């Protein structure tokens, strides 16, 4: 399951998941590629239960998107121990799966 983060404090709490891989999908409701990739991210969340999956609307929580230096959507940022380990920009399922598999 992919949980939506609705505030900076929810985002900070999500990143404090210890050594667990945290995947945050930065999206926008008006973004076509974001809508296209969303079902794949849900599928990855089911496949990789050792990771925590979140999504964040860049228009609702713009301060977090700015802080994370997100300028294109979708951008998926992968965190471990609260620190970014990699990111995938664009609706690229193969790159997203590779990033998850190599960091779980």
UniProtKB/Swiss-Prot annotation:
Residues bearing the modification Phosphoserine: 62
Record PANTHER family: THIOREDOXIN-LIKE PROTEIN 1
Sorted UniProt keywords: Cytoplasm, Deoxyribonucleotide synthesis, Disulfide bond, Electron transport, Golgi apparatus, Isopeptide bond, Membrane, Nucleus, Phosphoprotein, Protein transport, Redox-active center, Transport, Ubl conjugation
Cited InterPro entries: Thioredoxin (IPR005746), Thioredoxin-like_sf (IPR036249), Thioredoxin_CS (IPR017937), Thioredoxin_domain (IPR013766)
Further facts: Present with 17237 molecules/cell in log phase SD medium. Yeast has two cytoplasmic thioredoxins, TRX1 and TRX2, and one mitochondrial, TRX3.
A Gene Ontology molecular function term of the record: disulfide oxidoreductase activity
Compartmental location: Cytoplasm; Golgi apparatus membrane; Nucleus
Protein name: Thioredoxin-2
Main location: cytoplasm
Residues at the site labelled Deprotonates C-terminal active site Cys: 25
Residue ranges occupied by any Thioredoxin domain in the UniProt entry: 2-104
Induction text: Strongly induced by hydrogen peroxide and diamide stress in a YAP1- and SKN7-dependent manner. Also induced by reducing stress by DTT.
Entry membrane topology: Peripheral membrane protein
Gene giving rise to this polypeptide: TRX2
Subunit structure: Monomer. Part of the heterodimeric LMA1 complex together with the proteinase inhibitor PBI2. LMA1 binds to the ATPase SEC18.
Active-site residues from the entry: 31, 34
Superkingdom as given in the UniProt entry: Eukaryota
Pfam families: Thioredoxin
């Amino acid at each position: 399951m992919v949980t939506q983060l609705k505030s900076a404090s929810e985002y900070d709490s999500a990143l404090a998941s210890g050594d667990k891989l945290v995947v945050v999908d930065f999206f926008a409701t008006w973004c076509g590629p974001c809508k296209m990739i969303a079902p794949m991210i849900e599928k990855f969340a089911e496949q990789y239960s050792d990771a925590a999956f979140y999504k964040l609307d860049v228009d609702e929580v713009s301060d977090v998107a700015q802080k994370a230096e997100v300028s294109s959507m979708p951008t998926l940022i992968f965190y471990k121990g609260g620190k970014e380990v990699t990111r995938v920009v664009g609706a690229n399922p193969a790159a997203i799966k590779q990033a998850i598999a190599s960091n779980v």
